[in-house]
Amino acid sequence: MIIVYKTTNTINDRYYIGVHKTDKEIDNYFGSGLALKRAIKHYGKWAFKRETLFNYTDEDEHLAYAREQELLNVHLKDSLCYN
């Protein structure tokens, strides 16, 4: 399973959008962006929540990355976006 997800800092509402391949419905992955990692180190993992926006099969991985890019094209201009 491949997910397009949004990780949100519940303290300041900043967020990160990404793609993650997983076999589990729930795992502890929040993202790999440098700004996001710094924020997790600063605020602690408890301050973040991850929500799945879209699910894809492994065969449709290219669609997951295309959807992520569509979202980033809109959200990268947002000052709240960690990406």
Task: Go through each PLM region and give its residues.
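Structure-specific nucleic-acid interaction/processing domains
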Residues: 1-83
